[in-house]
Curated annotation (Swiss-Prot):
It catalyses: Thiol-dependent hydrolysis of ester, thioester, amide, peptide and isopeptide bonds formed by the C-terminal Gly of ubiquitin (a 76-residue protein attached to proteins as an intracellular targeting signal). This is Ubiquitin carboxyl-terminal hydrolase MINDY-1. It comes from Bos taurus. Hydrolase that can specifically remove 'Lys-48'-linked conjugated ubiquitin from proteins. Has exodeubiquitinase activity and has a preference for long polyubiquitin chains. May play a regulatory role at the level of protein turnover. The keyword NAD does not apply. GO terms for biological process: proteolysis. Keywords: Hydrolase, Phosphoprotein, Protease, Thiol protease, Ubl conjugation pathway.
Length: 469
């Protein structure tokens, strides 16, 4: 590599005398064995083999350390004496080498942005973050709570935000928290929790490891990930509970977490004890029948545990959602990017385990399907009509809870019975609406069940009139 020096003695002679230090002169004077007219192609090939070594160390060492590299890197030292062509080639090789390992990371941030939706929330324009199908739901769920609590604010009319910005806002909130107790021991414990939360913070953009316990809606196996929720004062809930009226399932599941229950099922299946095999089959059946990770008993307990007006995070099917309770009913924040332009779609009711729900605006008034035309009863009706719809809907829910239990349902609680009756009513309504063709939309599921129960009760009567005629 050092034989390049004799090729251009004149152009860089004075510069070489200044640039080459005594220690470098020793290196340059060693290769006397090279012929003066060495093949340039072999020299360029050797330079191509040596340059990647130099460039690989550039990001770590920087160009300041370039004057004192190991002997294998000294071949690039005479570069300034050979005019500018070798520097250009070196810079090009450096850029190419840096792009190769960094290209996946370089493309990631370009796609790692999320649209901001502005909604009227308690009299103030408030941003919420929407997500695509593969968005980081833990980060978005927590960030939306901070936005709805006005602990984090964005510039007006901001339309796009990156996950790095969200994590920066979240990190600022964590660092701004101060311990309530001033004892030295509690302060050390608090600082340790903050350190754990800051370590876990990057995982929010990819997903959290959460292990539920089937004993309560707020029972999770404690992991460092849970410290983020604890420090921010955000409740974390789930609704995957065992029905206490199934003693076999209660005995099989016990107080185990999900991971422990899966291990138990595998162990029991390979056991020679028939009782253990049976217990394993019962536990497996519980997981299969509750694959939605939400049971009616869990929904009842969740409704009772959540506080009125409280903002929390709801975990279900490996997805984290922002949840609140309004007038005794649970609602999930609609963060699907498909509803970005739907101003009347902000909340989605959570009143059964089968996914039937109705959409509401930011004031929890029922909203209609975005695809409906104004002639079909949808769209923005008069405020009086909207209030009447909301009132009918709430009356229907109250009547469902006051109805006497039918035969065969005496073992159900009042709230569970109300959920069951409401589910039957929704199914009847969907059957009545099956005749007219409707354009498919991502909100069709909620729109079919979004009509008030008062309207749905009138439809069978209208159909019976037609039959009589």
């Amino acid at each position: 590599m050092e034989h390049h020096q004799p090729e251009h003695p004149a152009p860089g002679e004075t510069r070489t005398a200044e640039a080459v230090s005594p220690e470098n002169h020793k290196v340059l004077s060693e290769p006397k064995e090279h012929p003066q007219d060495k093949d340039a192609k072999e020299a360029d090939g050797a330079a191509g083999e040596q340059e990647p070594v130099d460039q690989a160390s550039l990001p770590a060492q920087g160009q300041d350390n370039f004057e004192s590299p190991p002997p294998d890197a000294s071949s690039s030292q005479p570069g300034p004496a050979r005019e500018t062509r070798p520097e250009t080639e070196t810079a090009g090789a450096c850029s190419r080498l840096q792009e190769l390992p960094q290209s996946p990371r370089a493309r990631q941030p370009e796609l790692d942005f999320y649209c901001v939706k502005w909604i009227p929330w308690k009299g103030e324009q408030t941003p919420i973050i929407t997500q695509s199908a593969n968005g980081p739901c833990p980060l978005i769920a927590i960030a939306n709570i901070l936005f709805l609590q006005w602990k984090v604010k964005l510039p007006p009319q901001k339309e796009v935000i990156t996950s790095d910005e969200l994590m920066a806002h979240l990190g600022d909130c964590l660092l701004s928290i101060k311990p309530q107790e001033k004892s030295e021991g509690l302060q050390l414990n608090f600082q340790q929790n903050v350190d754990d939360a800051m370590t876990v913070l990057p995982k929010l953009a990819t997903g959290l490891d959460v292990n539920v316990r089937f004993t309560g809606v707020s029972d999770f196996e404690y992991t460092p990930e849970c410290s983020v929720f604890d420090l921010l004062g955000i409740p974390l809930y789930h609704g995957w509970l065992v029905d206490p009226q199934s003693p076999e399932a209660v005995s099989a599941v016990g107080k185990l977490s999900y991971n422990q229950l899966v291990e138990k099922i595998i162990t029991c299946k390979h056991s020679s004890d028939t009782n253990l095999v049976t217990e394993g089959l019962i536990a497996e059946q519980f997981l299969e029948t509750t694959a939605a990770q939400l049971t009616y008993h869990g929904l009842c307990e969740l409704t009772a545990a959540a506080k009125e007006g409280e903002l929390s995070v709801f975990f279900r099917n490996n997805h984290f959602s922002t949840m609140t309770k309004h007038k005794g009913h649970l609602y999930l924040l609609v963060t699907d990017q498909g509803f970005l332009q739907e101003e009347q779609v902000v909340w989605e009711s959570l009143h059964n385990v089968d996914g039937d729900s109705c959409f509401c605006d930011s004031d929890f008034h029922l909203s209609h399907s975005p695809g409906k035309g104004p002639g079909t009863g949808g769209g923005s009706g008069s405020p009086e009509k909207q209030r009447q719809v909301d009132q009918d809907y709430l009356i229907a829910l109250s009547l469902q809870q006051q109805q006497p239990p039918p035969q065969g349902t005496s073992g159900l609680s009042d709230l569970e019975l109300a959920q069951q009756l409401q589910q039957e009513e929704y199914q009847q309504h969907q059957a009545a609406q099956a005749a007219p063709a409707r354009a498919p939309s991502p909100q069709g599921r909620g729109a079919a069940s979004g009509r008030p129960a008062a309207e749905r009760r009138q439809r069978p009567k209208q159909e019976s009139d037609c039959v009589l005629l």
